[in-house]
Amino acid sequence: MPFGLKNAGSTYQRVMTRMFESQLGKNIKIYIDDIVVKSKMVLEHLWDLQAIFEILRNYKLHLNASKCSFGVGSGKFLGYMITHRGIEVNPNQIKVINNLRSLRNPKEVQNLTGMAAVLNRFISRSADRCRPFFMLINKWKDFEWTEECATAFQQLKDYLARPPIMSSPEPDEVIFAYITVALYAVNLVLIRVDGGVQQPVYYVSKSCKSLHKAEVRYLPLEKAILAVVLGTRKLSHYFQAHTVVVLTQLSLETILRSADYTRRVAKWGTILGVFDIKYMPRTSIKGQVLANLVAEFTKP
C-alpha cells in the first residue's frame, strides 16, 4: 500500500498488530514500521529476535539493514530515548530550548510553547510553568518580554537540565495518581511503584488557554474532578489497562456518588465510572524520592 494514501498508516498499523499479536505485550513494541524488541537478558534477547525473525519470514517481510541496531542498551524511538532505566527526553530537544535567548515576538514564543508541548509528559505542572508564555502569544502590538517571562524561561531550562525519567507500568499493575489545581490550570501525574520507590509515568497539565472559560471558574473540588476526567481522556490506555488509585485529601468519591451535586459532576461520574478508579487519602509519603516528587508536583 502506498504511504501517500490517507488511511495507509492506520491500515499498516492494523496489519502489523495482527502479525505480531503473539509477541505484543511480551517483548516487542510496534508503531507502524518502527519496531523495538526488548529483553532483560542477552540470551532471552536472542530467543526473542529469533521469534520475531520467524514471523517476518512467514509474511515475507524484509528489514533495512542500515536502519537496524542489535544488542543496544538504549536508542531513539518515536522521538524519545528508550533505555533500561525507562523513557527519557531526547537530549536534542532540550538542546534546542537551551540555545534560545530572550524571545522577540509572539511567533518565537509560539515556537517555544510548541517545543515545550512536545515534552509535556516529562514536565511537572507544565501549564503553570508556561503560563507567562501563553499570555504573550497574541500580543503582536504590545509584546514585551518581561522579567516574569525571563524568570519562567530560565526555570524551564533549569528543570529540563534534570528531566525526570518516565517509567512504564507492568501489565495489570496498580498505578497511582496525584492531582493539583490552580486558578488557571489543572494537573495530574501518574505514578507507579518499583522496588518500594514511586516513579512518574506521565504528567498531564491543562492551562486556562486550553480550558473553557466556564471551567476556569469552577470550584477547586470541581477542578480536581476535572483533572481526573482530563487524565482519562489523555491517558485512556493507562486507565483502561490498570487500576488507578487517586491519592487526594479531597472527598472526590463522595461528591461523585452524591445525587445532590451539579449536572456536570453527575456527567463526570458517568465518564469516570467506566474505569477502575479508586480514591484514597494522601495520608503518608514513603521514601525521600516520593517526598521530593510530590513536593515538586504540588508546590505553588
Label for each model-derived stretch:
Residues 173-181:
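Two-metal-ion RNase H-like nuclease active-site motif
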Residues 4, 90, 180:
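Short, conserved phosphate/pyrophosphate- and ester-handling motifs at nucleotide-, phospho-/glycolipid
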Residues 298-300:
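Long, charged amphipathic helices and adjacent flexible linkers at domain junctions
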Residues 7, 26, 31, 54-57, ...:
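C-terminal reverse transcriptase regions that engage the nucleic-acid substrate
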Residues 9-46, 122, 126, 233-243:
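Active-site palm subdomain of RNA-directed nucleic acid polymerases
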Residues 1-11, 196-226, 248-256, 262:
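A short, polar/acidic, helix/strand-boundary loop motif
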Residues 181-192:
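Acidic, metal-ligating active-site segments
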Residues 14-15, 48, 155, 223, ...:
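Well-ordered alpha-helical segments embedded in enzymatic catalytic cores
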